[in-house]
Amino acid sequence: MSDLVKVTLPDGSQKEAPRGTPVIDFVKGQIGPGLAKAAYFARLDGEPVDLSRAIERDARLEIVTTRNPEALEVARHDAAHVMASVVQKLYPGTQVTIGPAIEDGFYYDFARETPFTPEDLERIEKATNEAIKADLPFVRSEISMEAALALFEGMGERYKVEIVKDIAAKGAKTLTLYKHGDWVDFCLGPHGPSTGRIGVVKLLNVAGAYWRGDAKNAMLQRIYGTAFFDKKELDAHLAKLEEVKKRDHRRLGPQLGLFTFHEFAPGAPFWLPAGTVLYNVLEDAMRRLVLKNGYQEVKTPLLFNKRLWETSGHWGKYRENMFLVVDSESDPALPLEDRCSFSLKPMNCPSHHLIYRMDKRSYRELPVRYFTTDALHRNEASGSLGGLTRVRQFEQDDAHIYLREEQVTDEVLRIFELMKVVYGAFGLGFEATFSTRPEQRIGDDALWDRAEALLRKSLDATGLKWTLNAGDGAFYGPKIDMLVTDSLGRKWQTCTIQLDYAAPERFDLTFVGEDNKEHRPVVIHRAIYGSFERFVAILVEHYAGAFPAWLAPVQARVVTVSDRFEAWAREAGEALQARGWRVEVDASSDKLGAKIRNAQLAKIPFTLVVGEKEVEAKGVSPRRHGGEDLKTMPLETFAELMAREATAPF
């Protein structure tokens, strides 16, 4: 064996180095000190590794610098380790569990009887940043599972012991440890060279979290934080977080009279008058769009016998997420679960399959497109509920399309065109992910191979860039998920396009082909908004509650300078209402400034001032939300303005 290894760089060039050379030494000696200084971790043949990793074989080498967002993700994981070490030093007896990097930050879960206070958080943050400045190296090692178990048992870390045992049960023989100073944790890595490279850390908040996400387990304390290489970047991020707080739909929704919740119906929103208008505008717009694009609207029952869910596979794969209903005619002596032979529907697809199956179908009819906005119920864990983004009762702009296999690509392209119309109307950017077969699934591998290949081909045909999300498909088929980007640059999952070969088999769905023989259709499951509830949450935060005129619950409010002008104010308001616009009149005794301010706080797109000159001109003086005053104009001119700006774009 040669004592030299060949290292291939991203530009295709090759360099030689002594076998066993650490990556960082290779970079310093063969590339240059500038790259070595900027390097945070590396990839050897695509595998993320520490800069201290020895190059033992011919390999492709990529250096990841602090300019790469992936380096910041690793630095945040580094920060989680440092914070955990600080917590255990400041609060002896605290048990550590897990601490990953997450989007925009990191967290670590701790087991401690006494809750962390805001003062504790400040103390931990200060000590964490001091520990970072100590610039301690991260040192990687590997030990046997037996040694790892003995190590963490000796440390009294019962949660770590539990994880080690689980890893060993899966067949692992060794465990990777990372140590900085005298603190050690097991971790796949990679980590940065030393704590001093992390940058600056800010701790954000403390929240409760069940061990392993199970409400039956102990409640832990989760400390959230973030880290940036540069303080200016941190300050900009914190300013963004403040803006996010201001836009939080859980605050703005009730404030604007859109929705609320009640303890008697956890996870089920109450839509207030303004919110109901908003909801209906969204629903009506989508209905118009799909009906003129070949869809047929259907409605199906809310409650179904379990035989439907056994046929679809939900009873075996999804039952824990369903609301089960006791059959009143069942034997009371039976166990409760055996008496539950009905369920509220968590999905529309099985009932749509029943409709499709009611008639004999010809290939000439396909695609058959069913659309609905029926209510759905899913038994989400109480701890996961949050505003409108995670609820138990919701509606979707749900559609199921029955078609021949050769029609799939064209149909996916049609769906993408609808999606572009919808997201474009809201000014939302978008990108796609492709999710493949999960561990829990129905159908054989050959069927999944076929479905994944076809959906991948269809996604490629759109020309849209996409990323792979392996193992996250639905239990019955692969899917395309759309991530929309809001005005703050945040990404939200909305649209889904799922390809299903299994349902036609399970429900015996057929069509008569050109050969006069029966064939199986393919089913596409698709939604563009996703759930209305989640989409409303996105829009509230995207617009900060200041909806465009076509979407706003109240599009214009007429305000009087004094009660002398009430008659014309009401006449103008009624004339606009007669044209279909959503208009209110404020003829209260409040001063004009207060009326205008109230309209601005309510985020109404147009405030129409009516005083003496407006009465004389039979007009109004519009003021846009945000402060732009338009000149006094005849009422008819304003109605034309409304027609341009307040008409639904789809």
Swiss-Prot record:
<dbReference type="InterPro" id="IPR002314">
    <property type="entry name" value="aa-tRNA-synt_IIb"/>
</dbReference>
<feature type="binding site">
    <location>
        <position position="400"/>
    </location>
    <ligand>
        <name>Zn(2+)</name>
    </ligand>
</feature>
<feature type="domain" description="TGS">
    <location>
        <begin position="3"/>
        <end position="65"/>
    </location>
</feature>
<dbReference type="InterPro" id="IPR004154">
    <property type="entry name" value="Anticodon-bd"/>
</dbReference>
<keyword id="KW-0547">Nucleotide-binding</keyword>
<feature type="binding site">
    <location>
        <position position="525"/>
    </location>
    <ligand>
        <name>Zn(2+)</name>
    </ligand>
</feature>
<keyword id="KW-0030">Aminoacyl-tRNA synthetase</keyword>
<comment type="similarity">
    <text>Belongs to the class-II aminoacyl-tRNA synthetase family.</text>
</comment>
<dbReference type="Pfam" id="PF07973">
    <property type="entry name" value="tRNA_SAD"/>
</dbReference>
<keyword id="KW-0648">Protein biosynthesis</keyword>
<protein>
    <recommendedName>
        <fullName>Threonine--tRNA ligase</fullName>
        <ecNumber>6.1.1.3</ecNumber>
    </recommendedName>
</protein>
<dbReference type="InterPro" id="IPR004095">
    <property type="entry name" value="TGS"/>
</dbReference>
<feature type="binding site">
    <location>
        <position position="349"/>
    </location>
    <ligand>
        <name>Zn(2+)</name>
    </ligand>
</feature>
<feature type="region of interest" description="Catalytic">
    <location>
        <begin position="248"/>
        <end position="548"/>
    </location>
</feature>
<dbReference type="InterPro" id="IPR033728">
    <property type="entry name" value="ThrRS_core"/>
</dbReference>
<comment type="function">
    <text>Catalyzes the attachment of threonine to tRNA(Thr) in a two-step reaction: L-threonine is first activated by ATP to form Thr-AMP and then transferred to the acceptor end of tRNA(Thr). Also edits incorrectly charged L-seryl-tRNA(Thr).</text>
</comment>
<dbReference type="GO" id="GO:0006435">
    <property type="term" value="P:threonyl-tRNA aminoacylation"/>
</dbReference>
<dbReference type="GO" id="GO:0000049">
    <property type="term" value="F:tRNA binding"/>
</dbReference>
<dbReference type="InterPro" id="IPR012675">
    <property type="entry name" value="Beta-grasp_dom_sf"/>
</dbReference>
<keyword id="KW-0479">Metal-binding</keyword>
<dbReference type="Pfam" id="PF00587">
    <property type="entry name" value="tRNA-synt_2b"/>
</dbReference>
<dbReference type="Pfam" id="PF02824">
    <property type="entry name" value="TGS"/>
</dbReference>
<keyword id="KW-0820">tRNA-binding</keyword>
<dbReference type="GO" id="GO:0004829">
    <property type="term" value="F:threonine-tRNA ligase activity"/>
</dbReference>
<keyword id="KW-0862">Zinc</keyword>
<keyword id="KW-0963">Cytoplasm</keyword>
<comment type="subunit">
    <text>Homodimer.</text>
</comment>
<dbReference type="InterPro" id="IPR012947">
    <property type="entry name" value="tRNA_SAD"/>
</dbReference>
<dbReference type="InterPro" id="IPR045864">
    <property type="entry name" value="aa-tRNA-synth_II/BPL/LPL"/>
</dbReference>
<keyword id="KW-0436">Ligase</keyword>
<dbReference type="GO" id="GO:0046872">
    <property type="term" value="F:metal ion binding"/>
</dbReference>
<dbReference type="InterPro" id="IPR047246">
    <property type="entry name" value="ThrRS_anticodon"/>
</dbReference>
<dbReference type="GO" id="GO:0005737">
    <property type="term" value="C:cytoplasm"/>
</dbReference>
<dbReference type="InterPro" id="IPR018163">
    <property type="entry name" value="Thr/Ala-tRNA-synth_IIc_edit"/>
</dbReference>
<dbReference type="InterPro" id="IPR012676">
    <property type="entry name" value="TGS-like"/>
</dbReference>
<dbReference type="InterPro" id="IPR036621">
    <property type="entry name" value="Anticodon-bd_dom_sf"/>
</dbReference>
<keyword id="KW-0694">RNA-binding</keyword>
<dbReference type="InterPro" id="IPR002320">
    <property type="entry name" value="Thr-tRNA-ligase_IIa"/>
</dbReference>
<dbReference type="Pfam" id="PF03129">
    <property type="entry name" value="HGTP_anticodon"/>
</dbReference>
<keyword id="KW-0067">ATP-binding</keyword>
<dbReference type="GO" id="GO:0005524">
    <property type="term" value="F:ATP binding"/>
</dbReference>
<dbReference type="InterPro" id="IPR006195">
    <property type="entry name" value="aa-tRNA-synth_II"/>
</dbReference>
